Amino acid sequence: MLNNSPRRDHRGLCICEEDQMWSYEILGTDIYHLLAAFVLYSVLGWALESTYMSFCNRKFTNRGFGKGPFCPIYGFGGVLGYLILSPLRDKLVELYFLGAILATAFEYLVGVGMIRFLGELWWDYNNKPFNYRGIICLESTVAWGFYAIGIVQFVHDAMYHIIDKVQLQIGTHLIQGILLLVAIDYTVQLIRVFDIDVRSKGEALKERCQALIARW
């Protein structure tokens, strides 16, 4: 016998058909909350890092790849970190060390990818002790462990509390609008970066050709 009762979210509220795509779950959490948390972590991470670097440089420093206040590294890191580490909520020692290791590995992979595809790195640990290629260092690894505890124990629950205060339809529109703006922003920046790279390689090739011609 078919179950015709309406689907409900984690708060027991009915979900209309057009909103059901947002209720599909990944590792026990619906897509709506995952994307909303991703956006909030990305904005919060950008704000914290830009504030810190602006203080260090004594001038405003945008730590995002695009023009807007968005840093997806923190979005992915925060969401994935919580999904993986939340089972260790009551085991602080294991939570700290696993969080430190996973975050350091994630930071290294992101750094290598940026150097490979963008030709630049958004951070530089070369002046830090016990660093590796300027991408990771002991100081950041120690800090990542405490960040992991903070996210799992406090930040994520508070974030979900804020998300739940926003009406679902309004929240989905906000998420879609923000991600669309970010996609446009990042597309423009990628075009600019790769255009500069292509032009620089073209100029280098032109100089080599001119040098060969001059020899003849």
List the predicted regions and their residue ranges.
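Aromatic-rich, lipid-facing transmembrane alpha helices and their immediate juxtamembrane interface loops
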Residues: 16-216
